[in-house]
Structure formats: structure tokens, C-alpha cells
Amino acid sequence: PGYDAMFSAAAETNQAISCLVNADGLPEIDRMCSVHPNVTVVIDHLGRIGIDGVIRDSDVDMLCSLAKHEKVHVKGSAFYALGKDKPGHSDLVPLIRRVYDAYGPDRLMWASDAPPSLAVETYEDQISLIRDRISFLSEMDRDKIMRDTAARVVFFQ
């Protein structure tokens, strides 16, 4: 009942809900989005897929399946805590590609997760994966992911 009240309030007040959940919480997000299709939802930190060091296809499948809900967005952030958690984060590129293919750049946004992230890596480590090193992203995609999507979704521009 608590989630239903939260989603109902978000629908009534035109607020976005930002969800910090692990992959096992994604089915509940799916259920709530089915009941409340007009609520804007942002899944933080790629659904924390790989938080234990393992990126499971079933978790990625579940995150990608949420793209059927037009108002669901995904934040690519906390790279330092996902997968092999090494700066460079190249092990996350296949995950990011699948999420990109499911959602497109208009429903993806980057975030640093600072200040916690700054305890383990530099800001450059955090930003460079999306900004510089993912070859399938166009400049327009990067602009959307790095700036435009968040501006539109979070600030309702």
C-alpha cells in the first residue's frame, strides 16, 4: 500500500519518482508503472545491476523490459560500484548498450553519484565512459544522455 500511495501522489502532483532499487525490486516498479502509467519514473544506477560484481542477463532483461512503460527512464550512474568497479568501466559497456537499445538516448541520463563516488575515483573516471569511450553513441546521443534528458525529466522543461 505504501508504494501505491506514493505513485498516486506523484500522479496527482506531476512529480517524478526516482527509484534506488536493486534488480530484485524491478518487478515491483513494473507493477506500479502498470497501475500508474502516467507517473514519470527514473531508475537510479542502472537498477544497481552488477552491485555484487556479476552482471546477470536476467537482471538486464528485467530492466530493459521496463522500457515498455513510456515514462520510465534510467540513470547511468554509480559506475564505480557496479561490475568489476574499476575505473574505465569497460565491463559495463554491454549493459549500457542493452539499456540504450531498449530506452534510447531520450530516456537515459548520466549522473556522477558524487560525493560517494569521489571517495573511490575521480570525476574524470566517472564522466569519461559516456562522454568519450562508448563508440556507439553519437554526439547527439551524448548530449541527450549527459544533459538534455535530465533537464527535461527532472526539471520538466
Regions found by a protein language model. Give the residues of each.
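Catalytic pocket-lining loop regions of alpha/beta-barrel enzymes
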Residues: 1-109
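Mid-to-C-terminal alpha-helical segments outside catalytic/metal-binding sites
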Residues: 98, 102-109, 118-157
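Active-site glycine-centered loops adjacent to acidic/histidine catalytic or metal-binding residues
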Residues: 113
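Short, active-site-adjacent cap segments at secondary-structure transitions
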Residues: 81, 116-118
